[in-house]
Amino acid sequence: MKLVQIAGYLGSGKTTLVIALSKGLSRSGLKVAILVNEIGEIPVDGKVIEDYGFTVKDIGGGCICCQIAGNLTRTLRFLGDEQNPDLVIIEPTGMAVPGSIRETVEALNIDIGPTIVLFDTTRSEKLLNYETLKRLISTQIRDADFIALSKIDKVSEDVIEHASEAVSVINPAAGIIRLSTRRGDGVMTLATAVQEVTIKK
Amino acid sequence: MKDDLRSRDPLHEGIFAYSVSCLLSRDREIEGNELRRFARELMVSVSGTCFHYGAIDIGHIKAYIETGTGFLYADTLGDAGDVTIEGREGDAVRSFRLVLNSVIYGITEEAVKEATEEALERTISGFGLSRQPVAPKVIPLYRPEGGRHDG
C-alpha cells in the first residue's frame, strides 16, 4: 500500500484534483482508496467524492496533522487490513502541515509517495501577504515534493510566473506543475508521477 | 466540540469553522433550478456576511443539498461571481437536506457562527422555507493555551 498526499490551503482545488486523479488511476487498474479529512464536523468533501462513485473514508472533527493523528493511524490500519488498496490518496484539511502527516505515516511503515501541495494562483498575493496565512502556506510549500500551481486557467501568464517564483523561493527543490484541473492541464503529469511510485512498489 | 480536539498549532491561528446540517421544507414544490438558485444565493450571502463581520479571507464556504433524487454541491471563496454549483437537480421536492460548512480567516469563532447563521436564515426566509432545528456546531480550531496534543 502506497500513500500520496494532496495537500494545500483551503479552497486551492484539492477535492477536484483528488476526483480527477482517482478517475485516471482507477482506469489504469490501480485499486485506489480515498481518505478525506475535513475541518467541519459534518463532512462535505467526502460526500461529493462519493457522488463520483468512489469509496471514501472520512475523518472529521479536527485536523489529522495535529489534533487527531491517532484517527489517521487507525484509519490507515483499517484500510490496509480490510481493503488492501494499491494506493491511498489522502486529502488533508486545508490547514494541515503535510510533514506532520508524513511523520505519522512513516511511523506505521507505510510507503509514502510524493506529497503534492496545491497553491492557488488566483489568491497568491493574498495568501502570502497575511502573516499567519503566510506561515502556514510557506510550511505547506516547504513540505511538498510537487507544487501544483492551481487554477491557471483563471489568471494571466504574469501571475503564474510570479506565483512560480514565489513558491520556488520557499522550496527550490520541489517540482512545479501548472495545474488546471478543469481544463485538464497538469493532471496527467501528476497521475504519471503517482503511478510510477505506486508501480515501483 | 471536545476540548481535546481543539488545535493548538499556532499555524492554525485565526482560522475557524462552523458546520450546520438542517432539513428545509415548504408546502410549494421546489424545482431543481430553484435549488441551484438557493445554493448560489446562500454562498454569496454567507461570504458577504462574513466579510461584513470583518473576515480577511474566506477559506471556503461549501454546501451540499440532498433530495431523494438530486444532489447539488456548491462552493465559493468569496468572490460573488465565483460560485461553483455542480451535481444533479433531481425531481421537484418539498423538503431537502442542507449541509453547510464555513471556514473563515480573520474573525472569531463566534463571529463565524453568527455570520453563517445570519446569512442562512436570511436565505431560507427569502425562499419561503422553514428549517427544522438541528443543533449547530462550532468547530474551534485554535487554542493558544497548552493541553494534550496527540500529533
Can you name each region flagged by the protein language model?
Chain A
Residues 2-7, 12-129, 135-137:
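Nucleotide-state-sensitive switch-loop elements of NTP-binding domains
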Residues 138, 142-201:
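Canonical P-loop GTPase G-domain recognition
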